[in-house]
UniProtKB/Swiss-Prot annotation:
Catalyzes the complicated ring closure reaction between the two acyclic compounds 1-deoxy-D-xylulose-5-phosphate (DXP) and 3-amino-2-oxopropyl phosphate (1-amino-acetone-3-phosphate or AAP) to form pyridoxine 5'-phosphate (PNP) and inorganic phosphate. Belongs to the PNP synthase family. This is Pyridoxine 5'-phosphate synthase. The keyword Calcium does not apply. The record marks E150 as: Transition state stabilizer. PANTHER family: PYRIDOXINE 5'-PHOSPHATE SYNTHASE (PTHR30456:SF0). Homooctamer; tetramer of dimers. 3-amino-2-oxopropyl phosphate binds at N7, R18, G191, G212, H213. Its main location: cytoplasm. GO terms for molecular function: pyridoxine 5'-phosphate synthase activity. Pfam families: PdxJ. 1-deoxy-D-xylulose 5-phosphate binds at D9, H10, R45, H50, T99. It is an enzyme of class 2 (transferase).
């Protein structure tokens, strides 16, 4: 059974836009869980543009399964060791990007990533790596000691033509196949919506989808409960 993890970052984005204390991403997380979400995701960015440190602590307490997305930095490593999420997903981070633009480049940054993985594993925190759908990056993830990968689906979701979308889908399919053959847990996310998910669910080897913006956007119109249930219906 493929699971759904709901990212609540953009509930916090709406809150931070006005500098108030609502809407509360923790309340959104609770509603998502009640609707059937299998996990809650939050990305604590270095610039704290949406999720804040206190959100992470409260989400850890409220979520049945909490996934922390974070950059490979000493500060974030310290926070992860304190909070002890159920899973850490290591992601690249650029200050000026609107959202994460690509996967980790393990050919360039494999050393620091492997060191962080070792530290977190030593403290019984499983680690996934957010990577582009590239077999080489999948193999490097395995070599670095990751137990899971999250395949970046952004290029597929943003494809301008059907031909490009099919090409990107084939890249994802190949990456998933390589990851499975290496014994990795395979997750996927970034840009997935109620339309693009229909392609992704044909890849039965994917263990979990991480979806945030499209669910939060739909929730603004129909409520979190229905938004999550509608996505779960498509996944199942």
């Amino acid at each position: 059974m493929t699971h759904l993890a709901v990212n609540v970052d953009h509930i916090a984005t709406l809150r931070q836009a006005r500098g108030v204390d609502y809407p509360d991403p923790v309340a959104g997380a609770v509603l998502a869980q009640l609707a059937g979400a299998h996990g809650i995701v939050a990305h604590l960015r270095e610039d704290r543009r949406h999720i804040q440190d206190t959100d992470v602590v409260r989400l850890r307490a409220a979520a049945r399964r909490f996934i922390l997305e974070m950059a490979v930095t000493p500060e974030m490593e310290k926070i992860a060791l304190s909070v002890k999420p159920d899973l850490v997903t290591l992601v690249p981070e650029k200050r000026k990007e609107l959202t994460t633009e690509g996967g980790l480049n393990l050919a360039r940054h494999g050393g620091p990533v492997a060191k962080t993985i070792e530290t977190l594993h030593r403290n019984e925190i499983p680690v996934s790596l957010f990577i582009d759908p590239d077999p080489g990056q999948v193999r490097r993830s395995h070599d670095a000691g990751a137990m899971a990968v999250e395949i970046h689906t952004g290029a597929f979701c943003e494809a301008a033509t059907e031909k490009i979308r099919q090409k990107e889908f084939d890249r994802i399919r190949k990456a998933v196949e390589v990851a499975r053959n290496l014994g990795l847990i395979v997750n996927a996310g970034h840009g997935l919506c109620y339309t693009t998910i229909e392609w992704m669910v044909t890849l039965k080897e994917i263990d979990e989808f991480s979806i945030g913006h499209s669910i939060v956007s739909r929730a603004a119109l129909v409520g979190m409960d229905r938004a999550v249930r509608d996505m779960l219906a498509l996944i199942s």
